[in-house]
């Protein structure tokens, strides 16, 4: 009857799918490629080396189990793999050691920038306060002045003086809030926001982060990036900055932001 024929056709299609999976797995092994079970196991081993909080570790394991149940041929599999790769590549709780040598910092600032005595004095003051109160949230410096006076390069000198990594994003002409917060991973071609991408590139969670041309931000129908930056820069909120792609809070409180 009709039910039996439907059940039989369903079983046939499942058996065919299983047979093709096994065939593909064997071909991958013959070619010397990594089978997707090995890929999952490799990710699990890498995750064991990470200094994650319990929440992050549980979330990662849950998402990894989800990937394990997926068919490697579907588009969602590669999205899920990219998502888990991002988790493994981000520098969770990995900080570089600060160098609080104020004389050395003064020499680096003098070497790279002629004049600007008042600005350099304020920067050294900030570094002195950070040295005395190590538990203090990183200050946000805002450098204001005409083009070409060395605002952006001053951020690079501060990073060198502190022994921190240096990252910079240009905010000029940015109109979409998703540039800061990222897109939800359900969208095709979704990416994390520029903040999370830059931290991945820096390799530490406490770089000197230059936000260039902050006054050139403009809002549009896609949202207001300036409002999204408030969560990035507010010391009360940035301990748990939420990126739409990451779907987890990320601690930005140790990042030293320099706006120009």
What are these regions (language model features)?
Residues 1-133:
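Extended, charged alpha-helical coiled-coil/arm scaffolds that mediate oligomerization and mechanical coupling
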Residues 72-73, 92-96, 130-137, 165, ...:
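Active-site phosphate-binding and catalytic loops of NTP-dependent enzymes
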Residues 135-141, 205-207, 255:
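Pre-Walker A (Motif I) flank of P-loop NTPase domains
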Residues 137-171, 200, 230, 234:
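Walker A/P-loop
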Residues 143-145, 182, 213:
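The Walker A (P-loop) glycine that initiates the GxxxxGKT/S ATP-binding motif of P-loop NTPases
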Residues 161-191, 198, 218:
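AAA+/P-loop NTPase substrate/partner-engagement loops
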Residues 186-211, 242-249:
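Conserved alpha-helical scaffold flanking the Walker A/P-loop in AAA+ ATPase domains
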Residues 211-256:
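Conserved catalytic/switch belt of AAA+ P-loop NTPases
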């Amino acid at each position: 009857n009709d039910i039996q024929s439907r059940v039989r056709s369903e079983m046939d299609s499942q058996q065919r799918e299983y047979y093709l999976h096994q065939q593909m797995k064997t071909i991958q092994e013959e070619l010397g490629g990594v089978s997707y079970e090995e890929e999952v196991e490799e990710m699990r081993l890498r995750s064991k080396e990470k200094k994650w909080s319990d929440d992050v570790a549980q979330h990662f394991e849950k998402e990894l189990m989800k990937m394990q149940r997926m068919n490697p041929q579907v588009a969602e599999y590669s999205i899920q793999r990219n998502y888990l790769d991002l988790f493994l590549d981000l520098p969770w709780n990995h900080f570089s050691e600060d160098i609080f040598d104020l004389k050395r910092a003064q020499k680096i600032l003098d070497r790279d920038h002629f004049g600007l005595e008042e600005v350099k004095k304020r920067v050294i003051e900030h570094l002195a306060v950070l040295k005395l109160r190590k538990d203090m949230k990183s200050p946000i410096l805002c450098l204001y002045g005409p083009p070409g006076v060395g605002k952006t390069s001053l951020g690079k000198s501060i990073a060198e003086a502190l022994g921190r990594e240096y990252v910079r994003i240009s905010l000029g002409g940015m109109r979409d809030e998703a540039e800061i917060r990222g897109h939800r991973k359900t969208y095709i071609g979704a990416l994390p926001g520029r903040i999370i991408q830059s931290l991945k590139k820096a390799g530490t969670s406490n770089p000197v982060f230059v936000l260039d041309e902050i006054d050139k931000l403009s809002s549009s129908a896609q949202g207001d990036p300036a409002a999204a930056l408030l969560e990035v820069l507010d010391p009360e909120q940035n301990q748990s900055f939420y990126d739409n792609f990451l779907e987890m809070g990320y601690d930005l409180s140790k990042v030293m932001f320099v706006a120009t």
